[in-house]
Amino acid sequence: MILMIMALALVGCAVDNPALETEVQEANSSVYEVLIADYYNMVQFRLSEDVHMKLEQGEYYEISDTLEAAIPEEADYDWWCMFVEFPSGLTDPQVTDFGYLLKDINADGQPELFWILSDGRILALFTVWDAKPVLLGAYWPRSRVSVTEDGHLLVLGSGGADSQLYQVLQIPSNGEANILAEFGQDVGQAYQITDGKKESITQQKLTELIETYFEVETIDFSKEIQPLSP
């Protein structure tokens, strides 16, 4: 998942060709600039005083063709929930509460793009594959998303007071996120998902999985967040 991969052969030589690597990074930065502009417009629309009336009338914020193409169909629901809820938890939300971050989280030399709140909550994560941006995930503010030092994405989602889902994701260089571990509990019943199959587990096993995967050092992005601007 990563910045522009022009051809498979190109990827292999990028490490040994600093000039080519810089060229690829700059090209993908321009792709991200489009998404950052979309982000700013989305925040402006969502924070407008008459937003609820606009939504009731079927008026939505406009996004670029680039962003629209970056959101896979299966992510539509999560994207909409993120959009509706992202100001939650902010007493008096302003544009200054929102920022972005470019960070290479899988050590391939190319950064991913984070849409992130000033308090560190991650709203969305993008990468670039085949010269096009790809949405890796959109997250409700109630979710907790962090990145480990070894580049794994930790996602704690909630479907309610008694429903939690833990996911450990790896970000390879192919525009998709690989699930390394997935477990949680629903109405008090702990479970683990392996190869797409959901199986019940004990609370002790759930605790062990949480300790193994989630009680680890994560990266503090607070000093790297860039403010949104027109």
Where are the model-predicted features located?
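Beta-propeller blade termini
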Residues: 96-105, 143-153
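Beta-propeller fold detector
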Residues: 135-142, 178-184
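Repeat-based blade/solenoid architectures
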Residues: 87-98, 145-146, 163
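C-terminal motif of bacterial Sec signal peptides marking the signal peptidase cleavage site
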Residues: 9-12
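Acidic, small-residue rich beta-repeat scaffolds with periodic aromatic anchors
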Residues: 14-66, 156-230
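Sec-dependent signal peptide recognition
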Residues: 1-4
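Acidic/hydrophobic-patterned starts of short beta strands in beta-sheet-rich repeat architectures
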Residues: 106-117, 149-156
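Beta-propeller blade repeat segments, especially FG-GAP/WD-type strand-to-loop junctions
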Residues: 123-136, 169-172
